[in-house]
């Protein structure tokens, strides 16, 4: 980052221009790492913070690759899934997520997206989005996967409207917006989930249902 600024975005040997994206990505990655360690108090929870940092790095790759090519690398998705397995094995006491929650998270969003994908013949979204949410759901658990989808749909709708207004093109990559949702859910799924339940009145409805069942 420093060398790019000193050299004014040019190669030292040949003088060719170096894209600002490299610096933007590196800066974004560093800032996200700092925020994750601050959020999880990384000095006392280094493994949990490290896993989320790796997740964020993978999401940055997904974001820019899908934005440019409308393709999501399968190996990156597998890596995210492996992070989910590692989180359950090593951090389940910190996350409070059970194996059941991780497994439900794997299916609860990916299966509906798969159905939509098959019905629309991948016109609404691609299989990469399905695989991404399956892997992310394994990491986030049930509530986190739902929050990630909610944020992805909101940001995707806004981004899609802006793109259609600017270029008239209604086709856009959904992966970047899902990546934003996954990143937000990795840090704030409990807070957003609780707020949404209160806002929609679902908390009260569930409490009343439990009273009836009892």
Language model features by range: what are they?
Residues 161-184:
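Interfacial loop-to-transmembrane junctions
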Residues 19, 23, 45-49, 74, ...:
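Hydrophobic, aromatic-rich alpha-helical transmembrane segments
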Residues 37-51:
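Transmembrane helix-loop-helix
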């Amino acid at each position: 980052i420093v060398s790019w600024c000193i050299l004014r975005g040019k190669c030292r040997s040949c003088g060719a221009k170096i894209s600002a994206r490299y610096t933007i990505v590196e800066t974004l990655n560093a800032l996200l790492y700092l925020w994750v360690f601050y959020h999880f108090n990384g000095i006392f929870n280094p493994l949990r913070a490290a896993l989320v940092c790796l997740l964020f790095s993978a999401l940055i790759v997904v974001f820019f690759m899908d934005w440019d090519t409308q393709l999501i690398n399968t190996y990156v998705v597998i890596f995210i899934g492996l992070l989910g397995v590692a989180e359950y094995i090593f951090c389940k006491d910190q996350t409070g997520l059970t194996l059941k929650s991780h497994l439900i998270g794997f299916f609860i969003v990916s299966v509906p997206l798969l159905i939509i994908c098959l019905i629309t013949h991948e016109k609404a979204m691609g299989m990469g989005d399905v695989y991404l949410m399956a892997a992310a759901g394994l990491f986030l658990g049930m509530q986190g996967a739902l929050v990630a989808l909610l944020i992805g749909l909101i940001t995707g709708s806004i981004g899609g409207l802006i793109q259609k207004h600017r270029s008239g093109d209604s086709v856009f990559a959904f992966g970047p917006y899902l990546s934003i949702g996954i990143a937000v859910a990795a840090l704030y799924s409990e807070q957003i989930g609780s707020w949404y339940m209160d806002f929609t009145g679902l908390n009260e409805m569930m409490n009343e249902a439990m009273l009836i069942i009892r």
